[in-house]
Amino acid sequence: MSGDILVGEYLFKRLEQLGVKSILGVPGDFNLALLDLIEKVGDEKFRWVGNTNELNGAYAADGYARVNGLSAIVTTFGVGELSAINGVAGSYAEHVPVVHIVGMPSTKVQDTGALLHHTLGDGDFRTFMDMFKKVSAYSIMIDNGNDAAEKIDEALSICYKKARPVYIGIPSDAGYFKASSSNLGKRLKLEEDTNDPAVEQEVINHISEMVVNAKKPVILIDACAVRHRVVPEVHELIKLTHFPTYVTPMGKSAIDETSQFFDGVYVGSISDPEVKDRIESTDLLLSIGALKSDFNTGSFSYHLSQKNAVEFHSDHMRIRYALYPNVAMKYILRKLLKVLDASMCHSKAAPTIGYNIKPKHAEGYSSNEITHCWFWPKFSEFLKPRDVLITETGTANFGVLDCRFPKDVTAISQVLWGSIGYSVGAMFGAVLAVHDSKEPDRRTILVVGDGSLQLTITEISTCIRHNLKPIIFIINNDGYTIERLIHGLHASYNEINTKWGYQQIPKFFGAAENHFRTYCVKTPTDVEKLFSDKEFANADVIQVVELVMPMLDAPRVLVEQAKLTSKINKQ
């Protein structure tokens, strides 16, 4: 494939080659001409899917990328892109590959320094691009066609390999500049550079020796094992060694939780006591993809000895106190699978503790109330293999730790960035990615609190517009629970308008009769009846469930985390 091609057409064709089917975002005067080029890709499944606002679009791009592996969002210069920056920053923090395309004023207008609308009135057209440099792995503006293809390829390659957002600014005339199409016939380089053989062998030798000498080895899986695509290697490592394996909150769904070797969730000092004792007494910790944020570690309360630790990261390794830069964990894991002796590993593998939390009624509440310690273990029974589950910052993010997932569930949350309202936009991106995938029958399930819902509810409208069919659980507990637990238990600033008619949401947003179902559950009996309803479980239309829970009830881990956070905030 050679000859000339329009810059915008080249960009969209490359995205289509990388598996992106839907372009998210909001139209604006500086990106309209660029959007006209989407149809030139030539694939009827490659399309524009607009969002209700740019922030929701950025959240949706995050959710789409977590299911699909990559996503793209188009915004307009200044007002549009800054509306999206919170969502893009979240993707940067959480290692999610999002291509952010910004329609900018034309190159000719930029050269004049005109006081154009959507600017700060200072003639500087790179101000917003400079802002995004802090939350992007790579930033470029296409100002000519000569090297446009190479710049676009570099940006897309970095986005994928670094698993972080990139920024591509395209002036309104630049999308129609002519570029070479010759690269379209070549596959983008998406693999990490191979490790230095001598350094790699030294790392392998050290790890092998530690495994031989270990008596109580364990494996701990975290977020970056998922983000940097080593889950297949991790599964093979668990299968080979039989070592007890744990996940962090951000590592939920990284491994098969039906495995006999899955042993629970580690959250530092607020972990289940048996999990805490088992992992903190290890003499060999294989930590894969760690992202040690406060909510992911029980406010940094890990009690693990560095002298017993091997840390696997996307671009470096740490063995005990020695750092090995520029050593990619993917290749180390593949090499380990070849050199470790299975029978030797099996002889060191202790039996798991049988991690399985049962539903129980919370102290101080009636058995007719739906409490978190009852609901989340029961919710595990409702989940099916291959479900996509999105949980909101707050009670849902912590409650889901009490679920033991079926095989191949994809869990999406935002534990590090923690922007409330994220989950609704991410749900739309996720259900759209499922629709675009080879498995469009997978269920997409959202659990969101009433307070968070009020920030981003309009993206449910976009689901209805495109006939997407998520199951949406709304926790109706009268306001901001996590904030109340941290500070201001009865403060007015943690209150919201509690008079919303949740049963009216689909109809209000235009869902046709017989194309939606709504439910309100107030007791455990209501929940059990709903979960046994085959029509509900089939998810053949969009469904909204109002889940009424006590105002101050919360998952155990959240209660403990809130105490730690409150203490830190007062330091």
Swiss-Prot record:
Its cofactor is Mg(2+); thiamine diphosphate. Thiamine diphosphate binds at T395, G418, S419, I420, G451, S452, N477, D478, G479, Y480, T481, I482. Its EC number is 4.1.1.1. Disulfide bonds: none annotated. It comes from the Eukaryota. Pyruvate binds at D29, H118, E483. GO terms for molecular function: magnesium ion binding; pyruvate decarboxylase activity; thiamine pyrophosphate binding. Keywords: Decarboxylase, Lyase, Magnesium, Metal-binding, Thiamine pyrophosphate. Mg(2+) binds at D450, N477, G479. Binds 1 Mg(2+) per subunit. Binds 1 thiamine pyrophosphate per subunit. Belongs to the TPP enzyme family. This is Putative pyruvate decarboxylase C13A11.06. It comes from Schizosaccharomyces pombe (strain 972 / ATCC 24843).
